[in-house]
């Protein structure tokens, strides 16, 4: 057997992987052994798409190249010998020219923080290439119009279905995708920089695309090597281990017969995508790549069915089932269902066999196993030194878990075309309809039946019922139910009995989340299937086309999460944007594209972890406590290959003499320790930092850590607000942060006609899910100095903490932040821990140290949004006017105060959007043994605004009036606004500036709204199993202006460098600052400054260059940074005016050259502070959302959302629009799907993309309309602008409120059949907490609605 290293081509360049770790992934190789940093580590699970690349393989025999997208974080380098890889830089770049995909992403304003954009670019590019390739392989299709691809608009939406973005809300990304689709109406595309609003959309104005331009070409040199080498070597030596590439099953078996391997040291791989689910706990030194065995990739078609080799990818299997399946409905529906498994770039490499092996060996909740089980599939396996066996899939799944010596060879799916009366359906319930989410339950049913002419129902002759993912070891057949149904004529009573039997079969194992919900789902799916075989079972046919709504129509199921393969849920995304542009301050006010957007799309934009590792760099990973309250007695490591890579562990004892054990500090509110010492006070607290030679070794060694705990003499942990109340465990709120009550509550309550006492609502936490996890790189320097590059929203505070921890003066510490890959508050105080830990390690070891947290550690340590429990008592008149409100609120702050004492003020501020008459509250900030909660986008305001809506809806249901009536009745007038908001409302001198009432009436008090509400009611009257709701929610949001520095320097060539205290985190700060600089210096230019835009560069934040930088938080940093820059420019203009007057008309460059020759100072620094009489102002908006809820599954589709937001005189409407849409969709996640779960010790267990589900392209509104209105000018605001970053998040509660209306309709429907929802009051008034996940919605609709309906139907027809 020969020996060789893997050879790959990356963007056309040859690389030989010599001396690399055999477990090295392609992503690690790209980022450490090549100059290409476009692929990012977002999750390490194949769940986000940030690492996507295009892989190309060459078949020398056929002289054919195949290309596909893949997750480089899962793909092992050793499996890519003689492959070509194309990254986002290879698609296009600043030197060779940007690709149309990159330019369109930039032009459609589809990149904000930019961390996800290279992966988006690769996914779109791959989809375009695949569509063009498929079209060329088929019979000659009609030519596409010039500039378009073969991609359809529907396929374009799916192209990025596996890619996550936390910033944009996806709408502009989808527009960029669909701009390539031949069937798109260009007029439907949103705001872009290619044609102005109102101009005719024209394909010729888009960056030209040609499907003949194949970027991902396969290098000729690699083809030559492949032809001459004959393929991959049998053995490849890589660093500390070996890769084996057997060419036959016999060769595979011989490897084991020679006793070279044991179960622990060897890993068998075909694609390695399983490591995204089941992480390697240790390193392996031997890998066997079975993908080179031809028999495992074979596909055989016969009259009996299709035999698919175990190493065939899921994508290839889908293609075969669609094309070779002919008229076989079973094959087509299996293919459709498989398209919901994982994401495109995972399906392209993940194998059918690997998925089934994981289901058999590791109890993986496989969709594929369930679907193939119902289809009657068989498998062929072979063990070492044994004969081949053909087993039914059911037999195989029931066997003891396979070992590494058992090889799954193929899967055979029978062809059912020769049978008459076959009905086959598959179902799955998951938070995302396009896939990329594990099912709560999946099921597949196949029945052979005949129609009974007399009854019109079907007689079941044979049936197969398969269920999976409900909490069992593997997919199962419901044999008892099958036996019962055989020979039965399908009727309500038969289905009812089948359902009762099923509930005894589908039994989730102990510890399974939402067990009752999963059983209910199984019942719902069996009901759906069997009711299609019964005649006259439902007198309300599910046909939404009969009842159109204001946004879209649909056929069958429209929910985005639980679908039958024959249902149409994927309505196209449509949108509309309305805004007013102004030329008064041009280029300020223009919707110019984001600075550096093309660089972000190409992957050339540099984030902290993209900085090349310096010589002798070490890497760190946190070891954290899994116990909520315990003494740390010691840290040891399991004996393993990973633990051998440990260099040292940095703990509290390594803090320099004179330094403090401090990891974060919020000014005036308190510190949090960097290291647990000597007691860990919460699960997830940092105990130490493992230092190793590579980041991967550090990660794996940290997993091998064994912590010795001792709980003697310690009180039990306080984990909940209830525990905190019992132990009187609270943080004090400083007087200056305490909200003030309004009016006399007791007096106002006595005037009420009606009272609600002790209403309750709970809100969970939310994780930031910035795409770039916490990261830092520390360089030790001379004289006890240190430089730290970190991803931080507060570089100045980070400098403070690092200096305190090291015990050095502040001027010894330099913090540099160029750009941040998403923040949302999570890169404020939480970023300081990583930066400080890096600094301590680098200071101690005198070597550079880098840390980039893996997603799980980041999620466990991050803290997130504050969970809370609210109780309220409210009094109101019979006409709906509220007279008094008392709020009793318990906030879970975690172990340290951090930002938490400021949360009550924010909650009450948002609550005050309504005039409550008298307002009183008792708010406790609870100290608990969980990770400290921190500021997250709209901290406190998001919760307060929602609590207000919950109260108003409770009042409305009590009075049996429309909720909008109560909302409108209790909106402020100018007088009450000033009573409730005081100084924040000082600028609202007239109704034109207090725009909330106008906005609300524009949405909710119009004939159009009444028409839509009537259509919703009509739909609900004609649809039993789907219900719609519509709701309009107003918001107010007070923001605070803070001092901000700015520095403008004009260089001798006329280029301009600008520094500001704010950090670019995706909010468009650099773009607005660039526009403001051009405007403010425009007085010196003949064209008014627009020509200066290309001369301006905003440079990175540097705490030794720009002091008093402050915080990038609170939504006002962009405008205050702009004002500081305007002030600097004003001084420069005054200084340069005499030169300009003498010089007359001159080009900018010549003019500046003259000024320089005249020794004019060409730099100016300003520190802007707000007017003491105007330090805050109000923001207003409203949103109407319409949703559809599937009563059987709890799945929700947002049919339409209309947002109107008062942006003042927008500094950049495109940027502000992106902020509004992104905030709204992030809010949708908080209010609906993002379930933040912990174990009994408070340790976060929803700690990755597999368990924590942020919104994706398939969960945003199907019709997404946004209008930015420009209200009256105000001289105290920056060019009359307003904030846009945080306030729009509150509008997402309109989705939750609409869901409540739909659920209320369902409860009314099924109250008539008895049981389940209690009395009439409970039907309309019910507690609906946050988030309203699928299980929560289904429970509120009724877990037993199927049984109740069947019982009622059977009784009425008996």
Swiss-Prot record:
<keyword id="KW-0500">Molybdenum</keyword>
<keyword id="KW-0411">Iron-sulfur</keyword>
<comment type="similarity">
    <text>Belongs to the xanthine dehydrogenase family.</text>
</comment>
<dbReference type="InterPro" id="IPR012675">
    <property type="entry name" value="Beta-grasp_dom_sf"/>
</dbReference>
<dbReference type="InterPro" id="IPR036856">
    <property type="entry name" value="Ald_Oxase/Xan_DH_a/b_sf"/>
</dbReference>
<dbReference type="InterPro" id="IPR036683">
    <property type="entry name" value="CO_DH_flav_C_dom_sf"/>
</dbReference>
<dbReference type="Pfam" id="PF00111">
    <property type="entry name" value="Fer2"/>
</dbReference>
<keyword id="KW-0560">Oxidoreductase</keyword>
<dbReference type="GO" id="GO:0009688">
    <property type="term" value="P:abscisic acid biosynthetic process"/>
</dbReference>
<feature type="domain" description="2Fe-2S ferredoxin-type">
    <location>
        <begin position="4"/>
        <end position="91"/>
    </location>
</feature>
<dbReference type="GO" id="GO:0009851">
    <property type="term" value="P:auxin biosynthetic process"/>
</dbReference>
<dbReference type="InterPro" id="IPR002346">
    <property type="entry name" value="Mopterin_DH_FAD-bd"/>
</dbReference>
<dbReference type="InterPro" id="IPR036010">
    <property type="entry name" value="2Fe-2S_ferredoxin-like_sf"/>
</dbReference>
<dbReference type="InterPro" id="IPR005107">
    <property type="entry name" value="CO_DH_flav_C"/>
</dbReference>
<dbReference type="InterPro" id="IPR016208">
    <property type="entry name" value="Ald_Oxase/xanthine_DH-like"/>
</dbReference>
<comment type="subunit">
    <text>Aldehyde oxidases (AO) are homodimers and heterodimers of AO subunits.</text>
</comment>
<feature type="compositionally biased region" description="Low complexity">
    <location>
        <begin position="549"/>
        <end position="561"/>
    </location>
</feature>
<feature type="binding site">
    <location>
        <position position="43"/>
    </location>
    <ligand>
        <name>[2Fe-2S] cluster</name>
    </ligand>
</feature>
<dbReference type="GO" id="GO:0004031">
    <property type="term" value="F:aldehyde oxidase activity"/>
</dbReference>
<keyword id="KW-0479">Metal-binding</keyword>
<keyword id="KW-0073">Auxin biosynthesis</keyword>
<keyword id="KW-0001">2Fe-2S</keyword>
<dbReference type="Pfam" id="PF02738">
    <property type="entry name" value="MoCoBD_1"/>
</dbReference>
<dbReference type="InterPro" id="IPR036884">
    <property type="entry name" value="2Fe-2S-bd_dom_sf"/>
</dbReference>
<feature type="binding site">
    <location>
        <position position="48"/>
    </location>
    <ligand>
        <name>[2Fe-2S] cluster</name>
    </ligand>
</feature>
<keyword id="KW-0937">Abscisic acid biosynthesis</keyword>
<dbReference type="GO" id="GO:0016491">
    <property type="term" value="F:oxidoreductase activity"/>
</dbReference>
<dbReference type="Pfam" id="PF03450">
    <property type="entry name" value="CO_deh_flav_C"/>
</dbReference>
<keyword id="KW-0408">Iron</keyword>
<dbReference type="Pfam" id="PF00941">
    <property type="entry name" value="FAD_binding_5"/>
</dbReference>
<feature type="binding site">
    <location>
        <position position="51"/>
    </location>
    <ligand>
        <name>[2Fe-2S] cluster</name>
    </ligand>
</feature>
<feature type="binding site">
    <location>
        <position position="73"/>
    </location>
    <ligand>
        <name>[2Fe-2S] cluster</name>
    </ligand>
</feature>
<dbReference type="GO" id="GO:0071949">
    <property type="term" value="F:FAD binding"/>
</dbReference>
<keyword id="KW-0274">FAD</keyword>
<dbReference type="Pfam" id="PF01799">
    <property type="entry name" value="Fer2_2"/>
</dbReference>
<dbReference type="InterPro" id="IPR001041">
    <property type="entry name" value="2Fe-2S_ferredoxin-type"/>
</dbReference>
<dbReference type="InterPro" id="IPR002888">
    <property type="entry name" value="2Fe-2S-bd"/>
</dbReference>
<keyword id="KW-0285">Flavoprotein</keyword>
<dbReference type="Pfam" id="PF20256">
    <property type="entry name" value="MoCoBD_2"/>
</dbReference>
<keyword id="KW-0520">NAD</keyword>
<dbReference type="InterPro" id="IPR000674">
    <property type="entry name" value="Ald_Oxase/Xan_DH_a/b"/>
</dbReference>
<dbReference type="InterPro" id="IPR037165">
    <property type="entry name" value="AldOxase/xan_DH_Mopterin-bd_sf"/>
</dbReference>
């Amino acid at each position: 057997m020969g020996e060789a290293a893997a050879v790959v081509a990356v963007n056309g360049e040859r690389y030989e992987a010599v001396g690399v770790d055999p477990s090295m992934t392609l992503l690690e190789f790209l980022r450490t052994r090549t100059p290409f940093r476009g692929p990012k580590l977002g999750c390490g699970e194949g769940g986000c798409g940030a690492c996507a690349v295009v892989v190309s393989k060459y078949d020398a025999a056929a002289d054919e190249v195949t290309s596909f997208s893949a997750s480089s974080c899962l793909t092992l380098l050793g499996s890519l010998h003689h492959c070509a890889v194309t990254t986002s830089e290879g698609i296009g770049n600043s030197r060779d020219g940007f690709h149309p995909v990159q330019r369109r992403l930039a032009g459609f304003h589809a990149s904000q923080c930019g961390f996800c954009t290279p992966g988006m670019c690769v996914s779109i590019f791959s989809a375009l290439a695949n569509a063009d390739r498929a079209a060329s392989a088929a019979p000659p299709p009609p030519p596409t119009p010039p500039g378009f691809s073969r991609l359809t608009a529907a396929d374009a939406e799916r192209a990025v279905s596996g890619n996550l973005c936390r910033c944009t809300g996806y709408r502009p990304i989808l527009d960029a995708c669909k701009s390539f689709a031949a069937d798109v109406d260009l007029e439907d595309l949103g705001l872009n920089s290619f044609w102005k609003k109102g101009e005719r959309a024209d394909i010729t104005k888009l960056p030209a695309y040609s499907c003949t331009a194949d970027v991902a070409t396969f290098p000729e040199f690699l083809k030559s090597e492949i032809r001459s080498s004959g393929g991959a070597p049998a053995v490849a030596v890589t660093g500390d281990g070996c890769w084996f590439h057997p060419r036959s099953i016999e060769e595979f078996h011989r490897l084991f017969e020679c006793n070279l391997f044991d179960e622990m040291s060897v890993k068998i791989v075909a694609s390695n995508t399983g490591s995204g689910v089941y992480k390697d706990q240790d390193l392996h030194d031997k890998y066997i790549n079975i993908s080179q065995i031809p028999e495992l990739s074979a596909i055989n078609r016969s009259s009996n069915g299709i035999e698919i080799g175990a190493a065939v990818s899921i994508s290839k299997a889908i293609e075969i089932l669609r094309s070779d399946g002919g008229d076989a409905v079973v094959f087509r529906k299996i293919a459709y269902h498989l398209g919901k498994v994982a994401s495109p770039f995972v399906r392209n490499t993940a194998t059918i066999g690997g998925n089934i092996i994981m289901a058999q060996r590791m109890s993986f909740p496989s969709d594929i196993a369930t679907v193939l089980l119902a289809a009657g599939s068989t498998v062929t396996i072979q063990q070492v030194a044994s004969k081949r066996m053909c087993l039914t899939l059911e037999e195989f799944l029931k066997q003891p878990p396979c070992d590494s010596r058992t090889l799954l060879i193929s899967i055979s799916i029978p062809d059912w075309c020769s049978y008459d009366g076959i009905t086959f359906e598959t179902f799955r319930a998951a938070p995302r309809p396009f896939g990329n989410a594990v099912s709560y339950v999946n099921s597949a049913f196949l029945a052979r039946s005949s129609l009974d002419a007399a009854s019109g129902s079907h007689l079941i002759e044979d049936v197969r019922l398969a269920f999976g993912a409900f909490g069992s070891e593997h997919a199962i057949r419901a044999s008892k139910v099958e036996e019962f149904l055989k020979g039965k004529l399908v009727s309500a009573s038969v289905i009812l009995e089948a359902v009762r039997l099923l509930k005894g079969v589908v039994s989730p194992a102990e510890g399974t989340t939402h067990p009752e919900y999963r059983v209910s789902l199984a019942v719902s799916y069996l009901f759906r299937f069997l009711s299609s075989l019964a005649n006259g079972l439902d007198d309300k046919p599910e046909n939404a086309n009969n009842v159109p709504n204001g946004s879209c129509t649909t056929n069958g199921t429209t929910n985005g999460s639980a679908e039958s393969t024959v249902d149409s849920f994927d309505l196209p995304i449509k949108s509309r944007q309305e805004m007013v542009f102004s030329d008064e301050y041009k280029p300020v006010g223009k919707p110019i594209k984001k600075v550096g957007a093309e660089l972000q799309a190409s992957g050339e934009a540099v984030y902290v972890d993209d900085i090349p590792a310096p010589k002798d760099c070490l890497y760190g990973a946190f070891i954290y406590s899994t116990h909520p309250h315990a003494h740390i007695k010691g840290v040891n490591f399991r004996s393993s290959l990973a633990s051998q890579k440990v260099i040292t562990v940095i703990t509290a004892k390594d803090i320099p003499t004179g330094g403090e054990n401090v990891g974060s500090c919020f000014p005036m509110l308190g510190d949090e320790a960097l290291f647990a010492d000597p007691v860990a006070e919460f699960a997830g607290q940092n105990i130490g930092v493992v230092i190793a030679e590579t980041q991967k070794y550090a990660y794996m060694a940290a997993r091998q850590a064994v912590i010795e705990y001792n709980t003697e003499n310690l009180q039990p942990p306080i984990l909940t607000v209830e525990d905190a109340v019992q132990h009187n465990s609270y943080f004090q709120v400083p007087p200056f942060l305490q909200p003030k009550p309004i009016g006399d509550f007791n007096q106002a309550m006595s005037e009420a006609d009606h009272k609600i006492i002790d209403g309750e609502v709970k809100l969970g936490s939310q994780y930031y899910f910035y795409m770039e996890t916490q990261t830092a790189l520390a360089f030790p320097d001379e004289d006890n100095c240190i430089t730290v590059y970190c991803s931080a929203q507060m570089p100045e505070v980070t400098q403070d903490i690092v200096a305190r921890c090291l015990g050095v003066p502040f001027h010894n510490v330099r913090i540099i932040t160029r750009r941040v890959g998403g923040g949302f508050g999570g890169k404020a105080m939480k970023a300081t821990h990583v930066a400080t830990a890096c600094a301590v390690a680098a200071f101690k070891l005198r070597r550079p140290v880098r840390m980039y947290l893996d997603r799980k550690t980041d999620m466990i340590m991050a803290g997130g949004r504050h969970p809370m429990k609210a109780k309220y008592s409210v009094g109101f008149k019979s006409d709906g006017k509220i007279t008094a409100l008392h709020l009793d609120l318990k906030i879970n702050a975690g172990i340290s105060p951090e930002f938490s004492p400021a949360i009550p003020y924010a909650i009450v501020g948002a609550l005050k959007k309504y005039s409550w008459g008298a307002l009183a509250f008792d708010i406790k900030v609870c100290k608990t043994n969980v990770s400290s909660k921190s500021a997250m986008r709209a901290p406190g305001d998001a919760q307060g605004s929602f609590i207000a809506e919950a109260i108003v809806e409770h009042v409305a249901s009590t009075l049996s009036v429309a909720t909008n009536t109560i909302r409108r009745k209790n909106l402020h007038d100018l007088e009450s606004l000033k009573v409730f908001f005081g100084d924040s409302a000082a600028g609202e001198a007239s109704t034109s500036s207090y725009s909330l009432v106008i906005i609300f009436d524009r949405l909710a008090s119009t004939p159009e709204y009444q028409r839509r509400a009537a259509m919703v009611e009509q739909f609900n009257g004609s649809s039993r199993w789907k219900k719609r709701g519509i709701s309009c929610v107003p918001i107010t949001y007070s923001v605070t202006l803070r001092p901000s520095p700015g520095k403008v320097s004009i260089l001798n060539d006329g280029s301009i460098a600008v520094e500001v205290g704010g950090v670019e985190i995706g909010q468009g700060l650099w773009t607005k600052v660039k526009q403001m600089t051009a405007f403010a210096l425009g007085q010196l230019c003949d064209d008014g400054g627009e020509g200066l835009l290309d001369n301006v560069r905003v440079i990175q934040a540097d705490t030794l260059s720009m002091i008093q930088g402050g915080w990038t938080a609170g939504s006002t940093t962009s405008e205050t940074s702009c004002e500081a820059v305007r002030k600097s420019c004003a001084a420069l203009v005054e200084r340069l005016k005499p030169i300009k007057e003498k010089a007359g008309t001159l080009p900018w460059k010549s003019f500046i050259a003259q000024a320089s020759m005249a020794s004019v100072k060409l730099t100016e620094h300003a520190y802007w502070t707000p007017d003491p009489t105007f330090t805050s102002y109000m923001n207003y908006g409203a949103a109407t959302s319409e949703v559809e809820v599937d009563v059987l599954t709890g799945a929700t589709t947002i049919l339409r959302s209309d947002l109107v937001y008062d942006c003042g005189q927008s500094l950049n409407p495109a940027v502000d629009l992106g902020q509004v849409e992104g905030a709204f969709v992030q809010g949708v996640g908080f209010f609906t799907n993002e379930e933040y779960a912990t174990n009994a010790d408070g340790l976060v267990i929803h700690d990755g993309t597999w368990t924590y589900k942020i919104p994706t392209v398939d969960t945003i509104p199907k019709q997404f309309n946004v209008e930015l209105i420009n209200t009256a000018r105000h001289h105290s605001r920056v060019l009359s602008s307003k904030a846009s970053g945080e306030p729009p998040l509150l509008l997402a509660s309109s989705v939750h409120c609409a869901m409540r209306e739909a659920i209320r309709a369902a409860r009314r429907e099924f109250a008539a059949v008895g049981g389940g929802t209690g009395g009439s009051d409970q039907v309309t008034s019910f507690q609906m907490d946050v988030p309203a996940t699928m299980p929560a919605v289904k429970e509120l609709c009724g877990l037993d609605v199927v049984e109740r309906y069947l019982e009622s139907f059977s009784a009425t027809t008996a």
